[in-house]
Amino acid sequence: MDSAPPPPRIFSRRRRLNARARMAHLRRDGTAVATVARELAADALDRLGFLNRAFSRVLVIGDVTGSFAAGLAGSDTITRADPCESLGEALDEERPLPGGPYDLIVSLGLLDTVNDLPGALALMRRALAPDGLMLASFLGAGSLPIMRAAMLAGDGDRPAPRVHPQVDVRAAGQLMTRVGFASPVVDGWGFDVGFESLDQLVGDLRAQAIGNVLADPGPPLGKAALARARNAFADKASEDGLVRERFEVVTLSGWNPAPRG
């Protein structure tokens, strides 16, 4: 029987690591933007708070501000890891996770840029102890609609691949069931952030490693195309001069089934 074909390489591992290394460099002076990371960490802590359960051994991936690890109570060991070794213990989400089994694995803002999402979820489940919990959040379908429209306006009748494909709640739910998590829960939520310009938005995204890490990123916008994109973005400004961009988040949680009997 032929083995399954490898997943398509939509994202560049090198570009992804470079983006996170750039974020780590910007974070050294403590002033870098981290809006998305803080929102994801705060929501994850809120969700775990409702469980009324302590987790002894925890792996948290992508906690770039450290706010999740700092806010989690009752754990004996918390390991912070990241694809970029400057942000934690280095790991590759598409390879077996080191150091398990864990009672809790949390992934923040990363699964939207792995090439093999089902494989990454399966590897997390395998790294869990029986009755261990996986919780993951990442930017999903519907994120950055104004920027997407502005980029299309800039490209005109020759659109280029500039924005990542995105996972929606329904597809994520199907993946959780396929991978074998027990009692899977998948939901979407979001928040808005105001920006003065397209340039500010792009700069903030790059500072948070949310820039273009596609394997085929397309050519840069030319001068005229960039002007069209900036104007299209500015046209969405409110009376206060800010454009409120939307960030939609997909959150997944599920348990590693305990053995029967």
Please provide the spans of the model-predicted regions:
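Conserved Class I S-adenosyl-L-methionine
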Residues: 29, 33, 189-261
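Adenosine-cofactor binding site in Rossmann-like domains, unifying the SAM/SAH pocket
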Residues: 79-96
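N-terminal, positively charged/glycine-rich alpha-helical extensions of SAM-dependent methyltransferases
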Residues: 1-42
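A short acidic, Gly/Pro-enriched loop at the edge of an enzyme's catalytic core
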Residues: 93-105
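Conserved catalytic/acceptor-binding region of the Class I
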Residues: 135-198, 211-219
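A short glycine-rich, Lys/Arg-flanked "PGG" loop and its adjoining helix->strand segment in the class I
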Residues: 118-133
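A short SAM/SAH-binding and catalytic strip from SAM-dependent methyltransferases
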Residues: 102-118, 122, 138
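Conserved alpha-helix/loop element of class I SAM-dependent methyltransferases that forms part
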Residues: 35-57, 67-70
